[in-house]
Regions:
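N-terminal capping segment at the start of a domain
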Residues: 1-28
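Short coil-to-beta-strand
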Residues: 4-7, 66-73, 200-205
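Glycine-rich, flexible beta-strand/loop modules in the N-terminal catalytic cores of phosphate-handling
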Residues: 18-28, 45, 211-217
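Active-site metal-coordination/substrate-binding segment of hydrolases
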Residues: 39-43, 48, 58-151, 168
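Midchain, well-structured core segments that form catalytic/ion-binding scaffolds
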Residues: 120-129, 133-265
Length: 265
């Protein structure tokens, strides 16, 4: 664990904020500093390294039998704004430690071992899980706004399409990840095996009200959009709690227009 912690802190040097949190946005200077640190360790471990236009760092280590399919281990190196040390980076550090332990114990796998540090897993202008979607051919480069968004990062849709790799030579993909909920923690368990992951559906909801004087319009005549939105949020939360623990509901952003006049009490 000491080597994993050492690698985590090395990655964490890049994008560390004064409050102790971490910010490594996709394609950012801090992201590529972490990228370079991981690439350096890959080379020290004897891996052949490569990168792609999607911003992924990739390491390849030969097994006993080159004809065997690859075992891939990895995670992402970017973070949410003011994120934690472990999210994503823990999986990359853990993958590197797997190879280190194999070499230290002179264990040679039958299969090749590949390690990925993915870019742009978190929400961003080009879409979340971007790096892994790029290598699996799941990026829709024709979606509105994608061309302009990726060009801001110095790349073209064609370059992203070229990131796709052959998947028939992959045996499996493994990822070590921190628990982002509280189930294992509450049950005092150290580790769990994931059998399914969250499927995210996002909606933009508009509540249309009627603008009027904030101080003199009587309550019976008000049609405040924020009141309607508050009721929608409360009802959505209530419905999800009545179903089961496999469904969650979150509202992350509210924008009120014109929102020019406020009354304070």
């Amino acid at each position: 664990m000491n080597k994993i912690k050492e690698m985590l802190l090395k990655i964490g040097d890049f994008g560390k904020n004064p409050d102790g949190s971490y910010t490594r946005g996709c394609y950012s200077k801090e992201y590529f500093q972490a990228f370079n640190a991981v690439q350096e360790v890959m080379k020290q471990l004897g891996m052949e390294t490569s990168s792609d236009a999607a911003g992924n760092i990739h390491g390849f280590y030969k097994g006993k039998n080159p004809s065997k399919k690859s075992i891939i281990i990895g995670s992402h190196l970017d973070t949410v704004p003011h994120g934690g040390l472990f999210d994503g980076a823990y999986g990359v550090a853990g993958a590197l430690e797997v190879l280190r332990r194999l070499k230290d114990n002179q264990i040679e796998l039958e299969h090749p071992l590949e390690i990925y540090g993915f870019n742009a897993e978190e929400s961003n202008p080009i879409g979340g899980t971007f790096g892994s979607r790029a290598i699996t051919g799941l990026v829709d480069v024709k979606q509105p706004g994608f061309k302009e968004a990726i060009e801001k990062y110095g790349h073209t849709p064609e370059e992203i399409l070229a990131c796709q790799r052959e998947l028939k030579n992959v045996k499996c993909y493994l990822e070590l990840h921190i628990e982002q909920g509280d189930r294992l923690y509450n049950e005092h368990l150290d580790v769990g095996v994931v059998s399914g992951i969250v499927g995210i559906v996002r909606f933009k909801v508009t509540a249309i009200g009627a603008s009027n004087h904030a101080g003199t319009t009587m309550m019976k005549n008000r049609k405040d959009a924020m009141v309607a939105m508050a009721k929608l949020i409360a009802e959505g939360d209530k419905i999800c709690r009545e179903i089961d623990d496999t469904l969650v509901f979150t509202v992350g952003t509210i924008q009120c227009y014109p929102g020019k006049s406020r009354m304070y009490f």
